[in-house]
């Protein structure tokens, strides 16, 4: 059998070119590679975004806490933390919390010497727990505490729900009940039991009252500075009261007060007892906070509007449109993009190849 060979001849002119291999049009996309530096590619997918500032929002898939007690109207977070009259209510559980007051504003009710203690940290301490509740029972009987019997002091600046005189539910203002025990006393000690459910932290609020010399004698029978100490969970704190030198001060339109109170708290771990050593003017602990779980806390602002994937301290609420972001680096919680210094691109095409030239026919 004879083989038949068919020859295909292509006749070209001097101006003709034949392009072979992969070709593409010119590309504006440039990517930075580890081995070849800048490389032109036929296509890229941007992986980064630069957010714009927005309002804070609820975190998708979880409850987000703004104010400690949303239904406690006209109450600061410190009012709620101290259980001021008319400022007690349910604190919703939350796995994420907005720290909207870096330095919580003052409580009303009675003039507090905030700068002597860490009391302004109390709302933010509570905010860091997922579950928070105020005990239904008092931790001790204040009327029969050492140095008593006591009557429980109230203030016209702290109206209760019936608009009578009241005081913070977390503390009892222990005033000697009769003239027989309105005298100076050596330091007295009371044990503060653990009354929360096992596994919860117990946050016990306490403090002391001081006034000018005349009022100290009238209330307590002693005008000298008084000493106070709290101890719990390996932390011991000492105070000496200041006598007099206070200008009259009214809180929230209440009655002017010549005295001041210093308020502090101690954290008692599960099953652990605390102690308070005191003299005259003690504000004995009553209802305590029982707290458990952890809530992720981020600095932000209120109100919370809508829902977002991520909460970012600098940008507010974000939806995750890209896996990475550029711009300001700050704390973020939720389903958040990762911060990178420079934009990232993913090459989804081929390396740009210029058209190949056909050798001219000789």
UniProtKB/Swiss-Prot annotation:
Keywords: Disulfide bond, Fusion of virus membrane with host endosomal membrane, Fusion of virus membrane with host membrane, Glycoprotein, Hemagglutinin, Host cell membrane, Host membrane, Host-virus interaction, Lipoprotein, Membrane, Palmitate, Signal, Transmembrane, Viral attachment to host cell, Viral envelope protein, Viral penetration into host cytoplasm, Virion, Virus entry into host cell. The keyword Methyltransferase does not apply. Glycans are attached at residues 40, 74, 160, 181, 319, 348. InterPro entries: Capsid_hemagglutn, Hemagglutn_HA1_a/b_dom_sf, Hemagglutn_influenz_A/B. In natural infection, inactive HA is matured into HA1 and HA2 outside the cell by one or more trypsin-like, arginine-specific endoprotease secreted by the bronchial epithelial cells. One identified protease that may be involved in this process is secreted in lungs by club cells. Palmitoylated. Residues 1-15 form the signal peptide. It is a single-pass type I membrane protein. One of its GO terms (molecular function) is host cell surface receptor binding. It is found in: Virion membrane; Host apical cell membrane. The keyword Lipoprotein applies. Pfam families: Hemagglutinin. GO terms for biological process: fusion of virus membrane with host endosome membrane; fusion of virus membrane with host plasma membrane; symbiont entry into host cell; virion attachment to host cell. One of its GO terms (cellular component) is host cell plasma membrane. Belongs to the influenza viruses hemagglutinin family. Major glycoprotein, comprises over 80% of the envelope proteins present in virus particle. The extent of infection into host organism is determined by HA. Influenza viruses bud from the apical surface of polarized epithelial cells (e.g. bronchial epithelial cells) into lumen of lungs and are therefore usually pneumotropic. The reason is that HA is cleaved by tryptase clara which is restricted to lungs. However, HAs of H5 and H7 pantropic avian viruses subtypes can be cleaved by furin and subtilisin-type enzymes, allowing the virus to grow in other organs than lungs. Homotrimer of disulfide-linked HA1-HA2. Binds to sialic acid-containing receptors on the cell surface, bringing about the attachment of the virus particle to the cell. Plays a major role in the determination of host range restriction and virulence. Class I viral fusion protein. Responsible for penetration of the virus into the cell cytoplasm by mediating the fusion of the membrane of the endocytosed virus particle with the endosomal membrane. Low pH in endosomes induce an irreversible conformational change in HA2, releasing the fusion hydrophobic peptide. Several trimers are required to form a competent fusion pore. This is Hemagglutinin. The gene is HA.
